């Protein structure tokens, strides 16, 4: 489970410049340093651990978590994290209606499956070169948009979003459908839109990797619980929590980042 050292080393405490912020994030801000907001990592740690448990429990119940992250520095981390825990993902572009108009999205996925099947059984070779090329290009485009959700047969039970501002359409669609959203909250975000917020940097690659890695671990632990390893994992969690108490962390932990 994540520690204060992990958060500091990955730069999770660095927010945006003071001219770019959402006043609703004030309660999560520790101070200012060189016109950069410093996020209160004591709160980050508590929210992180609470959310970790929530995601783990969701996975233990067999729920599906959709990973969303389409900005350049997040794509690979989001995709790899989702694959590592067997969850669907969107890493290219969020198309409006991916949740609220899911039946139409399913039609596009079925079209992708049909073209793939034609390539596998050789039916595509019966077409003209022009027709085969058009289908191949269509498949490539469909795969870039829907490859990560190809096996998602129903709406997800939860979203993990990297950069809630950029992925605001995904967040709004989830809220519209009552789907809970987990997301790191940088200092320019609106915390009211996120069900399970974790105050932290959502731009730095190391910070993104940390968030993704922890979500993957939470989901895999939940799946292990579901398959029967509950007692062993609960014992490990209890030992870890007793080692580092989030409430016991003081301002001294921020000495290297004084404002």
From Swiss-Prot:
**What UniProt keywords apply to this chain's record, in alphabetical order?**
Ribonucleoprotein, Ribosomal protein
A single GO CC term, please?
Answer: cytosolic small ribosomal subunit
Q: Which GO terms describe its biological process?
A: translation
Q: Which InterPro entries match?
A: Ribosomal_uS2, Ribosomal_uS2_bac/mit/plastid, Ribosomal_uS2_CS, Ribosomal_uS2_flav_dom_sf
Positions of the region Disordered? 234-259
An MF annotation (GO) of this entry: structural constituent of ribosome
- Superkingdom assignment: Bacteria
Q: List the disulfide bonds.
A: none
Q: Where is the composition biased (Acidic residues)?
A: 250-259
Per the similarity annotation, which family is this? Belongs to the universal ribosomal protein uS2 family.
PANTHER family for this protein: 30S RIBOSOMAL PROTEIN S2 PROKARYOTIC AND ORGANELLAR, SMALL RIBOSOMAL SUBUNIT PROTEIN US2M
Q: What is this protein called?
A: Small ribosomal subunit protein uS2
> What is the protein's species of origin?
Sulfurimonas denitrificans (strain ATCC 33889 / DSM 1251) (Thiomicrospira denitrificans (strain ATCC 33889 / DSM 1251))
Gene that this polypeptide is encoded by: rpsB
